[in-house]
Amino acid sequence: MVKMAESLFTIFLEGVFIKNFLLIQFLGLCSFVGVTKDLKSASGMSGAVVFVMAMAATVSFALYNFILVPLKLEFLRTIAFIVVIAALVQLVEFIVRKHVPALYRSLGIYLPLITTNCAVLGAVLLNVMNDYDLAQSVVFGVAAGLGYTVAMLMMAAIRERSDLVEVPKSVGRGVTYAFFIATIMSMSFVNFFGVIPLE
C-alpha cells in the first residue's frame, strides 16, 4: 500500500512539474499563448483542461483495456482517444455556455480547440505507453492538468503584471513577449529534472 502511494505521488510530481506539458514538453502552446492575457480566462481554460484530462484518462483507460485490446484493435487508439476527447470537450463547452456565458465568450475559439490540444492527447497516450493502471492513469491525468494550470496561471499573472510596466519595443507585447516569458519559465522548470530519475 505504501509503495502504491509512493508510486502515485511520483506520478503526480512528474505530471505537475517534471514532465510539465507546457513548459517541458511544449505541448498545447496555442492556448498557452492565446488565453493567458488575463487570469480569469486562463483559470477558466485551465479548469476545463483539468476536467477533460482527468475524464479522458479514465474513459480512455477503460476503452483501451476493455474494448480495443481484447478486440486486437490497438492500432485505433489514437482515433478512439480523439473521439473521447472531442465528446468530453463538447460536454464542457455545453456546461460553460449554459452556466458561465461570460467565460464562454472570453475563451472564444480556444474552448473547442481543447479537442485538438496535443497536451490532452499526449497525456492519454502517455498513460498507454507507460502501461499505467486505472489509478495511475487518473492521477497522471489530473496531475498533467494541474501542471497545465500552474503554467497557465503563472503566465497570465506575469502578463497582467507586465501590462503595468514599460516593456522595451524590441520585445513587444504580443506573441514574441509571451514566448520570451515562456522561455524563462521553462528554464526554471528544467531544474526539476533532477528530482526524479527519468527512465
UniProtKB/Swiss-Prot annotation:
Enzyme Commission designation: 7.2.1.-
A cellular component annotation (GO) from this entry: plasma membrane
Domain of life: Archaea
Membrane topology: Multi-pass membrane protein
Alphabetically ordered keywords of this record: Cell membrane, Electron transport, Membrane, Translocase, Transmembrane, Transmembrane helix, Transport
Consequence of gene loss (knockout): Deletion of the rnf operon abolishes growth on acetate and ferredoxin:heterodisulfide oxidoreductase-coupled Na(+) transport.
Short name of one Pfam family: Rnf-Nqr
Broad class of enzyme this protein falls into: translocase
Subcellular location per the Swiss-Prot or TrEMBL entry: Cell membrane
GO biological process: one example: electron transport chain
InterPro entries: Ion_transpt_RnfA/RsxA (IPR011293), Ion_transpt_RnfA_Methano (IPR049674), NqrDE/RnfAE (IPR003667), NqrDE/RnfAE_oxidrdctase (IPR050133)
Main location per the UniProt record: membrane
Transmembrane segments annotated in the record for this chain: 8-28, 49-69, 75-95, 106-126, 138-158, 178-198
Protein purpose: Part of a membrane-bound complex that couples electron transfer with translocation of ions across the membrane. Catalyzes Na(+) transport, most probably coupled to electron transfer from reduced ferredoxin to methanophenazine and heterodisulfide reductase. Involved in heterodisulfide reduction during methanogenesis from acetate.
Quaternary context: The Rnf complex is probably composed of eight subunits, including RnfA, RnfB, RnfC, RnfD, RnfE and RnfG.
Family of this protein: Belongs to the NqrDE/RnfAE family.
PANTHER family: INTEGRAL MEMBRANE PROTEIN OF SOXR-REDUCING COMPLEX, ION-TRANSLOCATING OXIDOREDUCTASE COMPLEX SUBUNIT A
Protein name per UniProt: Ion-translocating oxidoreductase complex subunit A
Organism this protein belongs to: Methanosarcina acetivorans (strain ATCC 35395 / DSM 2834 / JCM 12185 / C2A)
Gene: rnfA
